[in-house]
């Protein structure tokens, strides 16, 4: 890997002369060491040179180039390997000018265990070879629906192995015809294995084979005069027919297909992923790039070259995440990322002397015998003409599928921006991967449905955003605040939760960019106070939250002042006209909401006064009569009169939303802590007593009561327990 040393003045020519004509990955850094962009290249020297030798770069790329202070490159053996490395680096480094999809939690699977009598179960996580996995499914609901179908048709067990091994009579599921009760040998191992095999074929989309086998089995029982068994198989066929009839509109000839639709609307982009597993359409999931309002035009859905606001967009990684209340999307410079994606000079533009013999007309898949509805996409030199949709789709495919299972068919609304991505997917999957851009028949219907769902999701998101922005504006107007950019309004809300003084926890939730930022939520374990003292708990959490922030800000201000004095000594013209006030620094909120009345607000005022913070940002939310929503009163710490808002107030709706989220976050944490405490033995809390010593104590005294009743001498007689440790244990238990 090449790592040129960073200097005060970046010299591109010196760096470019050292670059090889080999495939690899390049990274641009700014003066602070932050990664600006990660890209791949067939020829590193030509690709990187294109940024510094071209005279007609777009304004956005030119702006990025001016920030480059260092270039690093990594040579790979092939372009496919470079694509994999590029994808990994984008995920790890989250560069400002790359489109980044935030890793969502793993998709759910339906698992058939490797037990003698396999159990079917809902599963998330890494897969192994001991069990069978079917999926992934787009949602937990899709998995559970499939489990219910398999219970109704094949009657496979769902109980834990520990329950299965200890049952002496069938459970309720057997009585209602949802399990064949292998736990009590109500079915033979051979027959149960046949049901498992049929269930596997059903999940793989081979329903016809299952029906044929069941029909043959029914006739065989009838010919042997085993009419009860024949009737049972007939009922099984009837259940399966009912299921297939109910899902006739969803079932196609394909086994596994993913449908990817990209839609730009109202300044936002949505990627809608629909999944077909075993021929059944299992639903879809929408992903949205955050903060692209200024990057796309409302009318055209494309980038607006004249929008100068892009240069000042907020910094941070671009995050495509499912929009939820309290989502974890970080502030992002998506405008820059999307602009760079569109305006980036084509990789092969400098390679006019290479690949002159390439011919168009190859289908975008591996192998021969492509489906008749396969897109006639051709290997492209440079970027696709699909605009930003193709760029976003390529980013999604790379970050969603590389390293994960790839279905044999991808139906897409736009062609990926580069051919190499498809080649890498094929190499990784080990089977043919067909990318269809103009599907026919059922696949076409699926794509149209995915595009429609993407538009609906975008319309819903835009409507919710408009409502949320209106609430933010109403709150600032109500509080008499002047805020030039409402997206930068940051609200933090605190709540205290405990059960009769037990497991006291404080929560802090954050509202920023017109939505809850759950990745910035924090819980604080409150200790060293009288149980149930909410005032002391509030003092502790506010002090812990803001004390370090203020101290760090003071240190930063001192460093800046020293630098200014040094510069002023060298050049008196640089001396500041007047000393500026020391800011609190960090990520201070604009408003701090306190869930409580005058008492809690007074405690907060005292803490803020001690820390030198503005008490004007403190707002208490006191519950009204009967604790009914809509009767809350806002209490201020700076002497303003309490303010009662009407039930229909948009400002009150926002305050209630944030307050309720703080309460939810606090109470869930408190319950988890309380449950953990109650399930933990007192011996686990003893200092100096690990697992082995704890086991010896329990073996000697028979349990916790015996340990508590033991004297110091009895404790010291246990192997590994010294006299000093025995005295310490005795003191902690009494």
Curated annotation (Swiss-Prot):
Coiled-coil zones: none
Start and end residues of each stretch annotated as Disordered: 345-386
Keyword DNA-binding: no
Cellular component terms per the entry's GO annotation: cytoplasm; excinuclease repair complex
Biased segments, Acidic residues type: 346-365
SMART domains the record matches: GIYc (SM00465), HhH1 (SM00278)
A Gene Ontology biological process term: nucleotide-excision repair
This protein's UniProt keywords: Cytoplasm, DNA damage, DNA excision, DNA repair, Excision nuclease, SOS response
Subcellular location: Cytoplasm
Matching InterPro entries: GIY-YIG_endonuc, GIY-YIG_endonuc_sf, GIY-YIG_UvrC_Cho, Hlx-hairpin-Hlx_DNA-bd_motif, RuvA_2-like, UVR_dom, UVR_dom_sf, UvrABC_protein_C
Family designation: Belongs to the UvrC family.
Function according to Swiss-Prot or TrEMBL: The UvrABC repair system catalyzes the recognition and processing of DNA lesions. UvrC both incises the 5' and 3' sides of the lesion. The N-terminal half is responsible for the 3' incision and the C-terminal half is responsible for the 5' incision.
Entry protein name: UvrABC system protein C
Organism: Paraburkholderia xenovorans (strain LB400)
Origin organism lineage: Bacteria, Pseudomonadati, Pseudomonadota, Betaproteobacteria, Burkholderiales
This protein's encoding gene: uvrC
